[in-house]
């Protein structure tokens, strides 16, 4: 039983160490980009991209990173199961939404005009 808890403790320590490495890599990317601003921009950008990719790679090796990858795979599987609308259905729905929006805007414009005239009649102010 104690061997199992020791294994869990070292596993947690390893996880924490991985996250420390991730944060360190990101800090090196940020601080290095700031400190070496006299170096050519494409070279600095390449270094930042490499450091961020390395940080992402280390993050994917953690427990949360593996869970994120599993979630992404499941999400991709679910996206494949979706029955997407055809081009014609999408066009018809878009046209209906545009028409309803136009009608509602005209109704609201008319109501606004009526309310402005009503308020100006009551208050005696002319706009």
Curated annotation (Swiss-Prot):
It comes from the Bacteria. Residues 1-19, 61-97 are cytoplasmic. InterPro entries: SecE_bac, SecE_sf, Translocase_SecE/Sec61-g. GO terms for molecular function: protein transmembrane transporter activity. Disruption phenotype: Essential; deletion experiments lead to loss of the SecYEG translocation channel. Leads to loss of translocation of lipoproteins Lpp and BRP and accumulation of signal peptidase I (lepB) in a soluble fraction. It is found in: Cell inner membrane. The chain crosses the membrane at residues 20-32, 49-60, 98-115. Degraded by FtsH when the SecYEG complex is jammed or upon treatment with antibiotics that block translation elongation such as chloramphenicol. It is a multi-pass membrane protein. Its main location: membrane. Residues 33-48, 116-127 are periplasmic. Part of the essential Sec protein translocation complex which comprises SecA, SecYEG and auxiliary proteins SecDF-YajC and YidC/OxaA. Heterotrimer consisting of SecY, SecE and SecG subunits. The SecDF-YidC-YajC translocase forms a supercomplex with SecYEG, called the holo-translocon (HTL). The stoichiometry of the super complex may be SecYEG:YidC:SecDF 4:3:1, YajC is in the reconstituted complex (with SecDF) but as no antibody is available it could not be quantified. The heterotrimers can form oligomers, although 1 heterotrimer is thought to be able to translocate proteins. HAMAP family: SecE (MF_00422). This is Protein translocase subunit SecE. It comes from Escherichia coli (strain K12). The gene is secE.
């Amino acid at each position: 039983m104690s061997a199992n808890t020791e294994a869990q403790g070292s596993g947690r320590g390893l996880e924490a160490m991985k996250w420390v490495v991730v944060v360190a890599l990101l800090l090196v990317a940020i601080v290095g980009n700031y400190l070496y601003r006299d170096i050519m921009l494409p070279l600095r950008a390449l270094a930042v991209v490499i450091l961020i990719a390395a940080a992402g790679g280390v993050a994917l090796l953690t427990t949360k990173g593996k869970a994120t990858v599993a979630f992404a795979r499941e999400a991709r599987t679910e996206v494949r199961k979706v029955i997407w609308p055809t081009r014609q259905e999408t066009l018809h729905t878009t046209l209906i939404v545009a028409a309803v929006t136009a009608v509602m805007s005209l109704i609201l414009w008319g109501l606004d005009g009526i309310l402005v005239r009503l308020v100006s009649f009551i208050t005696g102010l002319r706009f």
